[in-house]
Amino acid sequence: MYHKDFQRIPGVGKSIARDLWDLGYRSTSDLRCQDPEDMYARLCLIRGGRLDRCLLYVFRCAVYFASETAHDPDLLKWWNWKD
């Protein structure tokens, strides 16, 4: 089930796991080196409107989590990825 793999990412629950699935990602490793701003813009198009900007911050955190092998604990908190 897609929820399990994505839910290993800090800040990602069932709803955001579904968003990632709808964007075409099938595993956490698929997020490596992706562009969070592009992910957010594409999801806004899929959903038919602007989404809460906090989702962008979670995407930034998720890409960091997937792309790096050693993690700074502060950067695993999505709210630390605000503009």
Spans of features found by a protein language model:
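C-terminal extensions
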Residues: 1-10, 14-83
